[in-house]
UniProtKB/Swiss-Prot annotation:
Keywords: Cell membrane, Cytoplasm, Endosome, GTPase activation, Membrane, SH3 domain. Residues 675-697 have a biased composition (Polar residues). Residues 265-372 form the PH domain. GO terms for biological process: cytoskeleton organization; negative regulation of apoptotic process; signal transduction. PANTHER family: OLIGOPHRENIN 1 (PTHR12552), RHO GTPASE-ACTIVATING PROTEIN 10 (PTHR12552:SF5). It comes from Bos taurus (Bovine). The BAR domain is important to associate RAB8A (or RAB8B) and RAB10 to endosomal membrane to promote tubule extension. The BAR domain is also important to recruit WDR44 to endosomal tubules. GTPase-activating protein that catalyzes the conversion of active GTP-bound Rho GTPases to their inactive GDP-bound form, thus suppressing various Rho GTPase-mediated cellular processes. Also converts Cdc42 to an inactive GDP-bound state. Essential for PTKB2 regulation of cytoskeletal organization via Rho family GTPases. Inhibits PAK2 proteolytic fragment PAK-2p34 kinase activity and changes its localization from the nucleus to the perinuclear region. Stabilizes PAK-2p34 thereby increasing stimulation of cell death. Residues 622-632 have a biased composition (Basic and acidic residues). The record marks R418 as: Arginine finger. It is found in: Cytoplasm; Cytoplasm, Perinuclear region; Cell membrane; Endosome membrane. Residues 633-650 have a biased composition (Low complexity). This is Rho GTPase-activating protein 10. Residues 598-608 have a biased composition (Basic residues).
């Protein structure tokens, strides 16, 4: 039951029950006062917590904005760029959200805290003052009555009458005060219902506004969120394929590390301990150096390096070798030692220690010592035998039979081309298809003997068994270029142009296959094979680099993008000629007039080695790989859906002349740098047809160059590795800005002054020092002083 009403007539009776009702009203107001006081305190704490949360959110957003993903390789996919930008988008979202939260926090003070404080002080405070007056007047009234009633009846009448009048006046005043107090009590009880709740409504309205703004921000963000989810899924799919390829390459190198040494400008390189002699009585010390030797020039370079000291490079030392002599164990108390004598330091020899006897023999062979008995570090590239799959009439028949069967029987099968068949069945089907006698007998469209997954796996295996990928080794790097940069339209234009540069048979088969893949993607709601999924499956199948490296595997994602572009633009690319009004793509090279680097020369091409899943009908028994048994589970055949790329024609330069993988035996000493082959066409001009060409060391647009005549693989030592004859030591000033694209080159702005400028063995390049760092400078970018 609620509070009983206070009747004004009861003010004159002032009964005990009236007083009880007043005390109940007073207690309720006191409880209300304490509640409002506590609520104000909690509200201020809420504001403080909101500000703390907002500061933490802003700090979190700031951290997101400042972080940037690094990537492996020289470019990112569109998906990766969107993922990189997502952190900034998240940061902006939080920033906008916190701006709304700040507005809400300010409104809490104005709409809740201040009105409640005003109500508590002005209204409840006024009642407290009225209560004090009422209590004081009550005490005074009844004290006066007690005193008046104690007057003796023997007093004079005039005195008694005066006392009666005074008491009556006091009682009237008490009644007036009592009436006002009762009125005030009931007024406050009613007023608090809106004076207190109205600020609460305003407070919640502010909260509703904040949450509505958050909802609107989330609604605006939803489209980006959906796109980002697709980007993440595409990147995850590519990662799964890339990881399996990296692990496969790692296992190959783990099993035969010597068969996978990478080509280098140096005939030999590795760690050696070098004896540093000191004056008596200090003896000598052995310091680890990374040594590099070029046999043709007899140039020996050694750089001190200690892994435990933070990996800092010391000052390098260069000399020209005169002779190398093996140290006998009775002449030194260390094993695996040999002496080298420098031609430019008469009478001075250095004692070096290899890590093992085998390494010492290898160094002695390369350096011209007496124990040249074992194979050296480097290995020549020997092509391995290929499978019997060919791009001929039989190949087109196989392709068309498989495609007809897939489109007739399994166009809606989930995971089409991703689900792999049993290896033995796939090999048997492909063998029958490639045999002229049995090919016509194979009925793929009606026979239940061949599952759809077996047919799709056979189709992919045929394409991977070709001596050269369908999109050719020669154009592999050119197809990768537009996938790494430019707008979507410019990418399509560049790939459109490059497809029409393919050999006619390659283009015809690619047309048939891509048309089929377009049909498959049109049924993606049923088979779940979107364009992105088909790109993951067929990217490594249609495009393979020549060398099997981690850099090549990192380019898998760009191969997938090229295949996606082919599928999405099949009609335009294969049914129309390239736009003649657009400039022909030029080679991806250094800027106009910039000298080429020897370290950027391409090595001689070799055929792709046969992988374990390639068709091996013509291999000798001793070389025949073992095939999985009939009951091999599909999970063991994942390589059928994600074939291993065997190379990468890398566009970046991770190290000097280290972009070629050596796979077979040969003499390291006989190896020499190769001359540049025909300049590769690229799609740079397609990507930025309007951009001006500014001098830069970075790749830029140049006019298409004529084909260069082939140059023999091995160059004479006098040409390839001749030490510099004319050495200058002058200053030079930069006349163009340059951005280095390799760690051995210098970046600089116009007007930079170089010290100690000398000629370099790299034709068209100089060596100089800028700000304490020494490196290569394009000769036509500077003016000698």
């Amino acid at each position: 039951m609620g509070l009983q009403p206070l009747e004004f007539s009861d003010c004159y009776l002032d009964s005990p029950w009236f007083r009880e009702r007043i005390r109940a009203h007073e207690a309720e107001l006191e409880r209300t006062n304490k509640f409002i006081k506590e609520l104000i305190k909690d509200g201020k704490n809420l504001i403080a917590a909101t500000k703390t949360l907002s500061a933490a959110q802003r700090k979190f957003a700031h951290s997101l904005r400042d972080f940037k993903f690094e990537f492996i390789g020289d470019a990112e996919t569109d998906d990766e760029r969107c993922i990189d930008a997502s952190l900034r988008e998240f940061s902006n979202f939080l920033k906008n959200l916190e701006e709304q939260r700040e507005i809400m926090a300010l409104s809490v003070t104005e709409t809740l805290i201040k009105p409640l404080e005003k109500f508590r002080k002005e209204q409840l405070g006024a009642v407290k003052e009225e209560k004090k007056k009422f209590d004081k007047e009550t005490e005074r009234n009844y004290s006066l009555i007690d005193k008046h009633l104690n007057l003796s009846a023997k007093k004079k009448d005039s005195h008694l009458q005066e006392a009666d009048i005074q008491v009556e006046q006091n009682r009237q005043h008490f009644y007036e005060l009592s009436l006002e107090y009762v009125c005030k009590l009931q007024e406050i009880q009613e007023r608090k219902k809106f004076e207190f709740v109205e600020p609460m409504l305003s407070f919640f309205q502010g909260m509703f506004t904040f949450y509505h703004q958050g909802h609107e921000l989330a609604k605006d963000f939803n489209h980006y969120k959906m796109e980002l989810q697709i980007n993440i899924q595409n990147t995850r799919n590519r990662f799964e394929g890339t990881r399996s390829e990296v692990e496969e390459l790692m296992n190959k190198i783990r099993q035969n590390p010597k068969d996978h040494k990478r080509a280098s400008q140096f005939t030999a390189e590795g760690y050696l301990y070098v004896q540093e002699k000191r004056p008596p009585p200090f003896g000598s010390s052995w310091v680890k150096h990374y040594c590099m030797y070029r046999k043709a020039a007899k140039k020996f370079t050694m750089i001190p390096f200690e892994h435990r000291s933070g990996g800092k490079l010391g000052d390098g030392e260069v000399f020209f070798l005169k002779e190398c002599i093996r140290r006998h164990t009775d002449s030194i108390d260390r094993r695996f030692c040999f002496d080298v004598e420098a031609a430019d330091r008469p009478g001075i020899s250095l004692t070096m220690q290899a890590f093992s006897e085998e390494e010492r023999k290898q160094w002695l062979e390369v350096l011209g010592g007496k124990e040249a008995l074992f194979p050296s570090f480097n290995r020549a590239i020997i092509p391995r035998p290929e499978g019997s799959a060919q791009l001929d009439k039989m190949g087109f028949t196989i392709l068309r039979k498989c495609i007809r069967a897939v489109e007739t029987r399994g166009i809606n099968d989930q995971g089409l081309y991703r689900v792999v068949g049993v290896s033995s069945k796939v090999q048997r089907l492909l063998s029958m298809l490639m045999d002229v006698k049995t090919c016509n007998e194979v009925d793929l469209e009606n026979s239940v003997d061949w599952e759809v997954k077996t047919i799709t796996s056979a189709l992919k295996q045929y394409l991977r068994s070709l001596p050269e990928p369908l999109m050719t080794y020669e154009l592999h790097g050119d197809f990768i270029v537009p996938a790494k940069s430019g707008s979507p339209e410019s990418r399509v234009n560049a790939i459109h142009f490059l497809v029409h540069k393919l050999p006619e048979k390659n283009k015809e088969m690619l047309d048939i296959l891509v048309k089929h893949l377009t049909n498959v993607s049109n049924h993606s709601k049923q088979n779940l094979m979107t364009v992105a999924n088909l790109g993951v499956v067929f990217g490594p199948t249609l495009m393979r680099p020549q060398e099997e490296t981690v850099a090549a595997i990192m380019d898998l994602k760009f191969q997938n993008i090229v295949v996606e572009i082919l599928i999405e633009n099949h009609e335009k690319i294969f049914r129309t000629p390239p736009d003649a009004t657009l400039p022909e793509p030029g080679p991806l090279s250094a800027p106009p007039n910039a000298p080429p680097r020897q370290s950027k020369r391409q090595g001689q091409r070799t055929k792709r080695p046969v992988a374990v899943y390639n068709l091996c009908l013509e291999l000798e028994d001793g070389d025949r790989p073992s095939l999985p048994k009939e009951d091999t589970p599909p999970s063991s055949l994942d390589s059928l859906s994600s074939p291993s790329p065997t190379t990468a024609t890398a566009l970046g330069h991770p190290g000097p002349d280290r972009n070629h993988l050596l796979t077979d035996g040969g003499s390291f000493g006989d190896w020499a740098p190769t001359a540049p082959s025909q300049a590769r066409s690229s799609a740079v001009q397609w990507l930025n047809p309007q951009s001006p060409t500014t001098p830069s060391c970075s790749p830029a647009v140049t006019p298409p160059s004529p084909k260069l005549p082939p140059v023999p693989l091995s160059l004479p030592a006098t040409v390839a590795d001749k030490p510099p004859e004319s050495i200058i030591s002058r200053k030079a000033r930069a006349v163009y800005p340059c951005e280095a694209e390799h760690s051995s080159e210098l970046s600089f702005e116009i007007g930079a002054i170089f010290e100690d400028v000398q000629t370099s063995r790299e034709p068209g390049w100089l060596e100089g020092t800028l700000n304490g760092k020494r490196g290569l400078i394009p000769q036509n970018y500077v003016k000698l002083l």
